[in-house]
Every structure is written in C-alpha cells, then in structure tokens.
A protein has these predicted regions:
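Carbohydrate-active catalytic/glycan-binding domains of CAZyme proteins
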Residues: 19-339
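Hydrophobic h-region of N-terminal signal peptides that target proteins for export
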Residues: 8-17
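Bacterial N-terminal signal peptides that target proteins for export
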Residues: 1-4
C-alpha cells in the first residue's frame, strides 16, 4: 500500500498538468464586433500603434458620422475626426478614449481621413488624408499631410506632402531595410491606382509614380514569413500582393475577407485594414458595413446602411499565400514592441 501511495503521488501531478488547459485556450477570443464608435457608430480605416507613454495599444480610426440624421449626399463621411480607442489586454478588447487633437483645421467643415502612424526616435509621425471641407459628393481635392506628436494625443502640422496630384488618399508608411522610408498612397486621378514616394528622413519626400497598376485604396504594407506583403481594399474583398524588394509586386489570385462571415456585424465584405505582426502572428484589423450584407441589405442611405465597425481576424500563411478565416475565434496577443 505504501508503494502504491508513492506511485500515485508521482503520477498525480502529471495528470493534473495534462488536464490543465493551455494558456491560449484560457484567453478570451476577441469579440465581434471588436469595436464600435460610441459617438457616431461609424468607425473605419483602423491603424494600431503601441503607446509608449501609456504602455497600451491605441487604435486610430476615421470617425464617420453614420448617425447624423441631418446629412445629405456623402456629407456624413466628410467633416470627420480621428477617433482613438485603447486596449490594455494586448488587443482583445478596446475602449473609446477620445478624438485626436489634430492642429490642422484650415477650412470650415474640415475632414480628416485614414491616418497611418509610425514612430521614429521617440517621435510619432502621422500621415493623414485632409479634405478642405464637408461636401455632398466626391469631386473635391484631397491631400496627405504630415503631423508629429510626442504623446499620440496632440498633433502639430509639419507639411503637406509634395505628391503627384491634388487628389490623393490613404497613406501607408514603411521603413525600408536601409533605414529610409517609403509611403504608398491612392492616386484617385489615375484610376485609383497605388503610387509611392520615398524619404531618407521622414521629412523630404520624392514621388516615384505608380507602384501598382490596380484599382484599390487603403494600401497596407508589412513583412511576414520572409516576404513583403501589400493588401489593398478593392471594394469586393482585399487583394493581396507579395514582393521580395518592395518594388515588384506579384498578385495572389484569391482575395481575403471577400466572403461574408457568420459573426455579429461581420456578414459583409472587409474593408481598409491594418496588419499588426506580433510574436510570429499576423492580425488583420478591418472594418465592415454590417447593413450592406448581400443576404440582408439595409435600405440605401439609412443609418443601418451607413454604420461601420472594426473587426479582427488572424492571417494564416499556407503554400505561399495569405488567407484568413473570419469565423475562427481570434485570440489577439499583441506584445509590447522590442524597441
């Protein structure tokens, strides 16, 4: 009996250990939707960045005025501010914080769209689409402006980028292997194709023309699995391209986030995304118009058709291609960046 007791004492801890769930299974999956704006219910165009001062993740997004009952035409997507949400649990849950204090309001009814943000030498740089007013249609100039901030909350104007036309939107900025910078954007005057500009120092920019002869907006460039990737919004899902040199891009036949999901507010195409790579995982943050699902569309111009929310899914790499299953539970685990 004594020998049996010794054996049981040795075996019991291993049984308990075997029954203990893995750390990942104990975590909660991200909710659907991931985030809804409490002011206008029109969150879109997300970008995620680590806030060094607060030691939390921040999400910046275009705050479309979906619930504005006085809007007519497309005024509800103009006159917009940039909202901020915060996550203290590695990106699983997000809480509305404020709108960004952007010190560039040169025109009455000014419009801020689709920021991208990078950090360099302790200073944050925002590249923001600026529209000089609130308009009922799309036929007006738009430029990309650069602002800087020490704290991600308060932003000072630096310059308007010298890009190729006066109708450009949706900056995506990436540090090249040699330490210089490249910015991709949508040139609306050239069939909404993707153009690019380079800078040695984030201050002086040279436009090099077309990067991708494809219609699309909201380019996002990132590195994962020893390749560079670009994802663009084609209004029918997200087109994927890969490159070895950040100049020559090969298309992937299949789009991602084209087929509707089953989760709450995720039954429409995914649009204008950000991708965060952390600890070998890549998470795609995108927005949907829940009221624009093909199966059950809301009436045109209704609040239900205008509202938008942020969702998240984990990217998967298989046979040289990117894919994602938006219906899989997504365990977001964004780690503090090493820098």
């Amino acid at each position: 009996l004594r020998l049996l007791g010794i054996v049981l004492a040795m075996v019991a801890p291993s049984i308990v250990a075997a029954q203990k769930p893995a750390a990942k299974s104990a975590a909660k999956p991200a909710p659907k939707p991931l985030f809804s704006d409490p002011i206008y219910d029109g969150a879109a165009d997300p970008v995620i960045i680590w806030n060094k001062q607060r030691q939390k993740w921040w999400m910046f997004y275009t705050n479309r005025r979906a619930t504005d009952t006085t809007a007519h035409g497309v005024t509800w997507v103009h006159g917009t501010r940039i909202g901020i949400a915060e996550s203290g649990d590695g990106g699983t849950t997000w809480t509305y914080r404020d709108t960004a204090n952007i010190n560039y309001r040169s025109d009455r009814g000014y419009t801020h769209w689709a920021p991208d943000i990078v950090e360099d030498k302790g200073l944050y740089h925002m590249f923001l689409t600026y529209v000089p007013g609130t308009f009922t249609d799309w036929n007006h100039p738009r430029v990309i402006i650069q602002l800087t901030s020490p704290d991600l909350q308060n932003w000072q104007y630096v310059q308007t980028l010298p890009l190729i036309t006066d109708k450009v939107i949706d900056a995506s900025v990436f540090r090249l292997p040699d330490g210089t910078w490249r910015l991709w954007y949508n040139n609306e005057r050239d069939h909404k194709s993707i153009y690019y500009a380079d800078s040695p120092d984030l201050r002086h920019w040279t436009d090099h023309g077309q990067a991708l002869n494809e219609r699309g907006e909201g380019p996002k460039v990132f590195r994962w699995h020893e390749q560079y990737w670009m994802i663009i919004d084609q209004w029918k899902g997200m087109a994927v391209y890969h490159s070895d040199d950040l100049l020559h891009w090969q298309p992937q036949p299949e789009r991602i986030l084209e087929q509707p999901g089953q989760g709450r507010d995720d039954q429409a195409i995914g649009g204008h995304c950000d991708v965060v790579v952390s600890a070998g995982h890549a998470y795609v943050f995108y927005f949907t118009h829940p009221g624009r699902s093909k199966a059950n569309p809301a009436p045109a111009n209704s609040i239900a058709a205008k509202r938008s929310v942020i969702q998240v899914a984990e990217l998967e790499f298989s046979n040289g291609k990117l894919k994602c299953d938006r219906d899989k539970p997504t365990y977001v685990q964004l780690l503090k960046p090493r820098k």
